[in-house]
C-alpha cells in the first residue's frame, strides 16, 4: 500500500476533507506526510532493528507487514493528523485505538527463553 492510501484512509476515518483548518492542500499534505513518517518509524522499529528510510513522497509504498499497514498505521496517522489540526477529541480517540493495536505487534513476536548449557 502506498503512503497516500494510508493517509487517505486516516482522513476518511477522521471525516476530514483535505482543507480542514489549513487553508492550503500543500500544508495539510506536509502535515499528513509527517504524521505518516512518525507512525511508520514507530511501528518499523517494533518489527525491525535497523534500515528505516523515511517516506519522502506519498506515492511511495510502505514496506511493512500487511496487518500493520491496513489495520494499525491509519489509526496512528489519524491521531497525529487530529493533533496537528487541534482536534483533541479525535486525537484522544484514535490515539487509544492506535496504542491498543500497536501492542498486538509485540504480542505476535515470539520470545524464546533459553537456559545456557554448561
Question: Predicted regions span which residues?
Answer:
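Conserved short "hinge" loops at termini or chain/domain junctions
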Residues: 1-62, 92, 96, 103-118
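Structural motif
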Residues: 62-72
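Short, hydrophobic/amphipathic alpha-helical patches that form generic packing surfaces
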Residues: 71-83
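Mid-sequence acidic-hydrophobic segments that form the walls
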Residues: 80-84, 101-108
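Charged, low-complexity interaction regions
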Residues: 84-90
Amino acid at each position: 500500500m502506498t503512503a497516500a492510501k494510508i493517509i487517505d484512509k486516516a482522513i476518511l476515518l477522521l471525516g476530514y476533507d483535505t482543507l480542514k483548518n489549513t487553508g492550503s492542500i500543500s500544508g495539510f499534505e506536509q502535515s499528513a506526510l509527517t504524521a505518516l513518517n512518525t507512525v511508520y518509524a514507530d511501528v518499523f522499529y517494533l518489527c525491525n532493528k535497523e534500515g528505516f528510510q523515511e517516506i519522502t513522497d506519498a506515492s511511495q509504498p510502505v514496506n511493512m507487514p500487511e496487518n500493520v499497514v491496513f489495520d494499525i498505521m491509519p489509526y496512528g496517522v489519524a491521531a497525529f493528523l487530529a493533533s496537528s489540526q487541534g482536534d483533541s477529541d479525535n486525537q484522544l480517540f484514535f490515539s487509544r485505538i492506535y496504542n491498543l493495536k500497536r501492542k498486538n505487534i509485540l504480542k505476535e513476536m515470539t520470545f524464546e527463553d533459553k537456559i545456557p548449557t554448561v
